[in-house]
């Protein structure tokens, strides 16, 4: 059993990017496999303290990597709410578990024996993997000399996005905007020292990205806000999740690459009818978009060289971290497990607790 603290002693942004880049080589060559994410939404009796739509979201992702002799399934069990902030719908996770905490675990299995070999808390892993995936997209799609970043969002995922970009590009200046009062300033003050980069808080999203080499969105918005008009020649747009860019970005960008073409499968309890009528909001993780994901190449194809990355300095490129895939958690769970075994970290649990003599 491995905690977030254990994972933090093994994971670096550098080894995370390396492990995931190798995974996308595997995926592009057909040498790894995953299924689309599954989300179950059901009513919750949790006291969330605000009068907004809320639900229990039970999410699973799985994937296998033969090269590592490993497979995993990631499970999150979240109480989520969907408030409106400054006219935009957001999704927030409520710390409803014991001690005001969250529930997210990766179960790592050996494909040699079929046995469960590790249970890993997923918080640290998740922060590293999202930033690393977007950085890999930037490595193949942004200009090599890109040094100025416009960042929209200053929450928990913003710092890892910048740390990952710094691994692949010579970042020297960042402008950050957040609609939450004081958040951008606090983020700039705390993160500038940690990264050794000049970070300035600005008054609007457009001011953040104007003249930037790379525009990064790292928000929990469930309403699109980034228009194609902000895509300047030579810019690379890196979106952390698919509800951030407006539809015209997909049409106007010269190159668009998705993390994956597979969408998650959402199953919503019919008990929400009354709530949906009251709030005028349909419970789901992401609102529907009129886009055919099959029209776009994925990151595995880009990394494996099956599709072209940036060809000219003036091209406007766009990477969308459309949704997570289980294989990314397999790759990093195996990295954490191997590193923790070498260091003697974690808590050993009896193997016989997780096997059975009766054939299932």
List the predicted regions and their residue ranges:
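Nucleotide donor/acceptor-binding cores
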Residues: 145-147, 172, 316
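N-terminal ligand-binding/catalytic initiation module
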Residues: 1-127, 133-135, 145, 326-330, ...
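Predominant activation on well-ordered alpha-helical scaffold segments within soluble catalytic domains
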Residues: 17, 21, 131-139, 162, ...
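Short internal alpha-helix immediately C-terminal to a glycine-rich phosphate-binding loop
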Residues: 129-150, 156-168
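Rossmann-like adenosine-cofactor binding region
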Residues: 196-286
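NAD(P)-binding Rossmann-fold cofactor-contacting core
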Residues: 168-195
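Adenosine-phosphate binding glycine-rich loop
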Residues: 4-8, 249-360
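Residues in the short beta-alpha loop(s) of Rossmann-like NAD(P)-binding domains
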Residues: 155, 179-180, 243
């Amino acid at each position: 059993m491995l905690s977030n603290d254990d994972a933090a002693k093994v994971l670096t942004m550098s080894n995370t990017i390396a492990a995931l880049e190798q995974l996308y080589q595997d995926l592009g060559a057909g040498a790894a496999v995953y299924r689309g994410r599954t989300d179950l939404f059901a009513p919750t009796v949790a006291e969330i303290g605000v009068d907004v739509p809320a639900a229990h979201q039970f999410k699973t992702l799985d994937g296998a990597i033969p090269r590592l002799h490993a497979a995993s399934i990631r499970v999150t069990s979240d109480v989520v709410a969907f408030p409106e902030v400054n006219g935009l719908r957001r999704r927030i996770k409520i710390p409803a578990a014991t001690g005001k905490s969250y529930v997210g675990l990766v179960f790592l299995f050996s494909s040699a024996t079929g046995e469960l070999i590790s249970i890993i808390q997923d918080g640290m892993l998740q922060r590293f993997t999202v930033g690393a995936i977007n950085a890999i997209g930037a490595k193949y799609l942004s200009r090599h000399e890109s040094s100025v970043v416009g960042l929209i969002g200053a929450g928990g995922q913003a710092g890892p996005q910048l740390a990952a970009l710094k691994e692949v590009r010579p970042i020297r200046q960042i402008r950050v905007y957040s609609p939450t009062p004081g958040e951008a300033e606090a983020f700039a003050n705390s993160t500038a020292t940690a990264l050794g980069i000049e970070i300035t808080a600005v008054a609007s999203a457009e001011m953040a990205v104007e003249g930037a080499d790379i525009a990064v969105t790292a928000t929990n918005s469930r309403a699109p806000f980034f228009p194609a008009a902000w895509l300047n020649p030579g810019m690379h747009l890196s979106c952390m999740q698919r509800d951030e860019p407006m539809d015209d970005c997909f049409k106007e960008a010269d190159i668009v690459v998705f993390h994956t073409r597979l969408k998650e499968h959402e199953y919503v309890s019919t008990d929400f009818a009354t709530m949906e009528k009251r709030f005028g909001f349909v419970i789901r993780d992401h609102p529907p978009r009129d886009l055919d994901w099959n029209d776009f190449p994925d990151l595995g194809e880009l990394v494996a060289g099956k599709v072209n990355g940036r060809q000219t300095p003036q091209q406007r490129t766009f990477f969308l971290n459309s949704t997570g895939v289980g294989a990314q958690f397999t790759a990093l769970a195996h990295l954490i497990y191997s590193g923790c075994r070498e260091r003697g970290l974690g808590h050993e649990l009896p193997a016989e607790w997780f096997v059975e003599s009766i054939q299932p």
